[in-house]
Amino acid sequence: TLMNEYKDKIGEVIIGYYQRERNGNIYVDLGNAGKVEGYLPVKNQSKLEYYEKNDRIKALIVDIKPTNTGIQLILSRSDKKLVSSILEREVPEIGDGTVEIMSIVRDAGYRTKIAVYSKREEVDPVGACVGLKGVRIQNVIRELESEKIDVLKWDPDPTEFIKNALSPAQVDRVVILDAEKRQALAIVQDTQFSLAIGRQGQ
C-alpha cells in the first residue's frame, strides 16, 4: 500500500510543486496521479518564503496521514533536519562520516547556526562545509531561500565552543556558571554586544 511505501520515508526530503493555498496552508503536488498529496501547514513554513502556482518546493516529510483518495504527506520547510539533509548532499565529507554535524540551531527564514566536527585532523570541518569560494554553502543557502547560515567549529571545551558560537563577535572571556545546567556568561566589549546577542537577543 501507499502507506507502507511512504512510512519509511519520514525524515527524507521530497520535491513537489505548489498547487494551492487555503488559510495559509499550502498543498503540494507530488505527482503519483494525485494519490499522494503534500501538505505544508503554516506552522511548518519558513517565515520569509512566498510561493506562487507551480513553484518548486523542497521539503522534509514529517508525518503521513491516510485520505479518501490515497495519502497526505505532512511537510516542513522549517525543520532543522531539512538543513542537515541538504548539507549532507552538498558536502561529501559529511556523507562519508569524516565531518559530523554536532548541533543545529535554526530560526527558520532568518538564520541557522551549524556546529561541525572533523574526525580527521587534516580536514577542516568548516572549510569542508563552506567549500571552495563558498560554493557548497551557497547551494544550501539557495535551497533555503537566502536564509543566513553560520558554520562553526564544534569544540569539546565549552569555553572554546561558546566563543566559536558567538563568532564573528569577539569574546573577551567566558565564565561557566553551571556546567550541569549548561549556563555560561560571555563577556564582550560594548561594541561587540549587538553582534554577540544577535537578532532580538537570540
Segments the model singles out, each with a brief description of its role:
Residues T1-Q202:
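RNA-contacting regions in translation and RNA-metabolism proteins
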